[in-house]
Amino acid sequence: IAAISYSYIYFNSSYQKIMDKAKMSKAGRSSLQTIAKDLRNAGYKNINYTRSTWDRWIEKIDAHNGTKGDKLRIWYNISTQDRIEISYYLEKNTSGETYLVREVIENPVINPMKRNCERFDTQKNCAPITIIENATDFQVFFNDKDGNRLNNVNISSTENQSKVHTAEVYITVRSPNELLKNPITFEMLNGGIAGQFTKSDKYLRETFYISVYLRNVVKI
């Protein structure tokens, strides 16, 4: 009976690990595809758009909102009259765990209207969409045409925005369940003002990465 019980526990544990790793991989890769699509659109301006000054294309904010993660903001036209602002950043739940969200605002300069609301016209109960439920870290780096890191890329400096050639995005995803027998310390070494931080627990973590050529920003 003991042997059968042990075999069941081992099988169940192995199955859970396989399932969790598959969920982590799917979450990390699908979110990177979404972010990459927005990054490729960053800075796109319709030739007939004249509603506001074209001075914002891409921005990074270090250690956003009390987390160690970055905030990425992207702007581009979706029509001759409309522009959207898309933000990616970490939020904390009531347990203090972080998750990655995507927020979309239509015409952020002239008449800002958030998407994903219970009622769009009255902006009732608007909230960003969660794209990764268990995200430990979210980091963004901008590089110039020579591969050098760029700092202070924000809407207060169009000069720095125009220098961005590629963007690197790193997302660290945590397993939904505790899968390790003993706690392991994970150390995150981040740039900017975030610095390094550690997590010590029984969860698995995996970091997913993508580098994107900003085809529209390069043309500006």
Feature roles, as predicted:
Residues 124-220:
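Short linear sequence signals and composition-biased patches located at protein termini or domain-edge surfaces
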Residues 4-132, 144, 159, 170, ...:
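Extracytoplasmic beta-strand-rich oligomerization domains located immediately C-terminal to a leader/signal peptide
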